[in-house]
Regions:
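Conserved, structured core segments of small domains
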Residues: 1-99
């Protein structure tokens, strides 16, 4: 199994509501053993150059394991950010030599 990083992006004007933490917890729970690292929320955001298109910001990242890119995308398809007009960037993790 390969590892994939999920970068979660939301519209720049997004504000979470009271149900947001429970929604994320349920989604992470549904990933089961595919969730390698729940990751962290990003509390502040800045960028240099073109990153993810205008009008969105990164709010968190996680790492999952999957057979291939299609399987990783299938894991991301029900992510809560999609409900609010955001997106999930998915990419394979390249392990460092000697790690």
């Amino acid at each position: 199994m390969a590892k994939y990083v999920f970068s979660f992006r939301v519209p720049s004007d997004y504000r979470p509501d009271a149900g947001t933490p429970a929604e994320w917890q349920a989604w992470f729970g549904g990933l089961g053993s595919a969730l390698v690292d729940v990751g962290h929320a990003v509390t502040d955001y800045a960028s240099l150059g073109e990153v993810g298109g205008s009008g969105s910001r990164m709010v968190a990242y996680s790492v999952v394991s999957a057979e291939d890119m299609d399987s990783a995308l299938a894991l991301a398809k029900d992510c809560p950010v999609l409900r609010v007009g955001g997106g999930v960037e998915v990419g394979p993790v390249m392990e460092a030599a000697g790690a």
